[in-house]
Amino acid sequence: MAAGVEAAAEVAATEIKMEEESGAPGVPSGNGAPGPKGEGERPAQNEKRKEKNIKRGGNRFEPYANPTKRYRAFITNIPFDVKWQSLKDLVKEKVGEVTYVELLMDAEGKSRGCAVVEFKMEESMKKAAEVLNKHSLSGRPLKVKEDPDGEHARRAMQKVMATTGGMGMGPGGPGMITIPPSILNNPNIPNEIIHALQAGRLGSTVFVANLDYKVGWKKLKEVFSMAGVVVRADILEDKDGKSRGIGTVTFEQSIEAVQAISMFNGQLLFDRPMHVKMDERALPKGDFFPPERPQQLPHGLGGIGMGLGPGGQPIDANHLNKGIGMGNIGPAGMGMEGIGFGINKMGGMEGPFGGGMENMGRFGSGMNMGRINEILSNALKRGEIIAKQGGGGGGGSVPGIERMGPGIDRLGGAGMERMGAGLGHGMDRVGSEIERMGLVMDRMGSVERMGSGIERMGPLGLDHMASSIERMGQTMERIGSGVERMGAGMGFGLERMAAPIDRVGQTIERMGSGVERMGPAIERMGLSMERMVPAGMGAGLERMGPVMDRMATGLERMGANNLERMGLERMGANSLERMGLERMGANSLERMGPAMGPALGAGIERMGLAMGGGGGASFDRAIEMERGNFGGSFAGSFGGAGGHAPGVARKACQIFVRNLPFDFTWKMLKDKFNECGHVLYADIKMENGKSKGCGVVKFESPEVAERACRMMNGMKLSGREIDVRIDRNA
């Protein structure tokens, strides 16, 4: 269509030129009379000239007299060492002016021995076919055919694509370009552009229209640089130097130009939608690709909708009857032999259905046998119904059903046995893993070393517990309400833990020997407890009375059933008897006075089993017990006024941040971590007045600090990935 417009513009230009030669309008004649045309028609002529310039696309050169036609000749049997320039010189010498020469190249840039030559005039094309046909070039006779519609070149190009997949534009021309699916399936990109891009024959310049008049080439380059490397950007201007609202952008690669069309066509720039397309000079002059021909429809049919196949293509109904091994299921007969043939293929089997079922054991670990049973049952029911209905091929399914009998027997025999063996092998592995857990738990027998630590509790800190217990009274009152809330939650959680804890029961039995070794150590602890009863404990224990009442109700919610499921009864009464608890209950507890009350008794009864099982859980590292930190830990925690023991790790509220940007200040650090919770303190580590790239942040609770580690660790600040950890040295 654009070519037709240009042709019309040329005709209009010719008419204007003829009018100018005949006489300028409005110029008075020799007798002073006005000419045949008045001065009022001059603006109309100027408008025509402007329209002519716009339609011609800025006076671009068009080498063809009639742009709608191409006068091509297709030459084959060209020596492989002949370059396109040499071929052009030969054709120019023998025929005349040549517009375009293209050698077809393979993927390696070597000549395929054929070429396309375009001429400006039709006579030149016919002369080339007469003169150059059978002309000897380097000992090889050339074969020249007229090819105005490009059919011969199209076939040759298809043959090249089928063999090598490459095509060049000339000497050293590029091969076929691999196009990503995002471009191939993009509805905004025409098919002819995609074909030209694949062949490497597409330019890298795009044409942009409907630009705002204040957009200059710098702004245009800035915008289109998002699509690729911009080599040049131009804004077309009028004779006064003002923008015409159109421009061109040249990229480094053709695929970047196609990407620019996809990214910016229809997008707003200063509230005006841009119209982006390939520039006419970037498109190949000859179309050597098969056009996208629409599907031929019957006469009178306007169109069709989407089919049921992939991409809306119609599907062949014949393929629907070819199910995977399900035979031909229809009113005439079920075709059970088809089921057998299909299932045989599932395992690479051969033979009828019965022989194939032997190998069903291969699928023991991966197939849902219940689902297979359901499918077979439904198939048998359908077969019985069809057999009862009779008629047609109904009887043809009976032999297939009979053949299924021994096959199903084999499925229940050898196949299921193999499944059992496979499951048994898996359970054996689980058993071996549990045995390994037992060995680990056996190593906990080193609890005997706890005895020496407990023995140190007496002289180190137990005598000083009186003043500490007084201070504990108020704290325990605050803990009471929390324990009540914990009761309901722990009870619900322990119910879920019942099944896994049952499995650990056998392992806990192995802990019995380790607990038995604790007996003599706890006997020594009984003697130390007798020293704990100075009069100063009375006031503190009186305050603990109501607190223990609350703890009792919380422990009641935990439920005895949940504790029984924990497998603690397997530890044995003998082990607990040897712990020397009778010495702790006789004299020591009586001297602790009525302040403990019956609530403490009930609480201790319910806490006994739980504390017995969990007492050693805090000492995960055997190396701490070897160093005697057990006794020192309790001495520090009971004897000191709220001090933390060196052997027991406490949760810190401070985090340490590494790899911070060097321009980061403490205020910026605080503002950033305020997203995680309330920050009490933030600081940047400095050296000689310069940041060391690390800092600390302190929160109001350990939970907030841990949340900050989870949220901020690995986050990028100014391009640097920070490392956030709990500050253990705080």
Swiss-Prot record:
Write out the entry's keywords from A to Z: Acetylation, Isopeptide bond, Methylation, mRNA processing, mRNA splicing, Nucleus, Phosphoprotein, Repeat, Ribonucleoprotein, RNA-binding, Spliceosome, Ubl conjugation
Start-end of Basic and acidic residues biased regions: 38-50
Residues annotated as carrying Omega-N-methylarginine in the record are: R496
**Residue spans of the sequence repeats:** 400-405, 407-412, 415-420, 426-431, 433-438, 440-445, 446-451, 453-458, 461-466, 468-473, 475-480, 482-487, 493-498, 500-505, 507-512, 514-519, 521-526, 528-533, 540-545, 547-552, 554-559, 562-566, 567-572, 575-579, 580-585, 588-593, 603-608
Phosphoserine modification, residue list: 29, 86, 204, 365, 377, 397, 432, 452, 468, 481, 528, 575, 588, 618, 633, 637, 701
Q: Could you tell me where this protein is found in the cell?
A: Nucleus, Nucleolus
Positions of crosslink type Glycyl lysine isopeptide (Lys-Gly) (interchain with G-Cter in SUMO2): 17, 37, 69, 83, 88, 127, 134, 143, 145, 221, 277, 285, 345, 381, 388, 651, 667, 685, 692, 698, 716
Pfam families tied to this protein: HnRNP_M_NLS, RRM_1
Q: Which domain of life is it from?
A: Eukaryota
Spell out the GO cellular component terms annotated for this protein, sorted alphabetically and separated by semicolons. catalytic step 2 spliceosome; collagen-containing extracellular matrix; extracellular exosome; membrane; nuclear matrix; nucleolus; nucleoplasm; nucleus
Recorded GO molecular functions are: mRNA binding; protein domain specific binding; RNA binding
InterPro entries registered for this protein in UniProt: HnRNP_M_PY-NLS, hnRNPM_RRM3, Nucleotide-bd_a/b_plait_sf, RBD_domain_sf, RRM_dom, RRT5_SRSF_SR
Q: Where is the RRM domain?
A: 71-149, 204-281, 653-729
Q: Where is the composition biased (Low complexity)?
A: 1-13
Q: How does it assemble?
A: Identified in the spliceosome C complex. Interacts with PPIA/CYPA.
Q: What is this protein called?
A: Heterogeneous nuclear ribonucleoprotein M
